[in-house]
C-alpha cells in the first residue's frame, strides 16, 4: 500500500491504493475535491461522486495519479476509483496552520483553473459587486 509521499514518484496515469484522512472538502465549478493526508504528507483528491466526510479516514483505491508542472501531484478517484471508510484513524502530523495554508493554495489554484476553463465566472472585487467604489 502506498503512502501520500509514494504517490509523487508514480507517473501520471498510474493507479495506487493508499490510506489517508480527509482534512478539507471543497467544490469548484462542479468538481468535488478533498485535501487528504497521512504521516508522509498531504495531497489533493478529485472525488467525483465518492461520498467522504471531513475528519474520517479512508482507503482510496484505484486512485489515478496526476503529475503537474512545478512538481506537484494529485490523485483522482472520479473515473473508477473509490473511497472506503476504515476504522483506524490515519495519523496526520502536520499542524493546523500548515494544513490550512495548503488548503488555501490548492483551492485557489482550482478556482483559477475553473475560471480559465469557463466553469466559474471571472473574479470581481467584492466592493464592485455591492455597488461600492474600488
Question: What spans do the regions from the language model cover?
Answer:
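Small-residue (G/S/T/A) turn/hinge positions that recur once per unit in extracellular repeat modules
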Residues: 61-64, 81
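Generic beta-strand structural signal
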Residues: 56-58, 73
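OB-fold nucleic-acid-binding modules
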Residues: 1-26, 51, 68-134
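Beta-strand/loop nucleic-acid-binding surfaces
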Residues: 31-56
Amino acid at each position: 500500500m502506498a503512502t501520500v509521499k509514494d504517490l509523487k514518484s508514480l507517473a501520471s496515469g498510474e493507479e495506487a491504493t493508499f490510506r489517508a484522512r480527509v482534512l478539507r472538502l471543497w467544490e469548484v465549478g462542479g468538481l468535488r475535491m478533498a485535501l487528504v493526508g497521512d504521516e508522509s504528507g498531504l495531497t489533493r483528491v478529485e472525488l467525483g461522486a465518492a461520498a467522504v466526510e471531513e475528519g474520517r479516514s479512508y482507503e482510496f483505491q484505484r486512485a489515478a495519479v496526476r503529475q503537474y508542472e512545478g512538481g506537484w501531484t494529485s490523485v483522482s478517484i472520479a473515473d473508477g476509483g473509490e473511497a472506503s471508510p476504515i476504522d483506524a484513524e490515519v495519523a496526520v502530523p502536520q499542524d493546523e496552520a500548515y494544513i490550512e495554508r495548503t488548503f488555501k493554495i490548492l483551492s485557489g489554484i482550482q478556482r483559477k483553473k475553473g475560471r480559465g476553463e469557463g466553469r466559474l465566472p471571472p473574479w470581481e472585487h467584492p466592493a464592485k459587486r455591492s455597488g461600492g467604489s474600488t
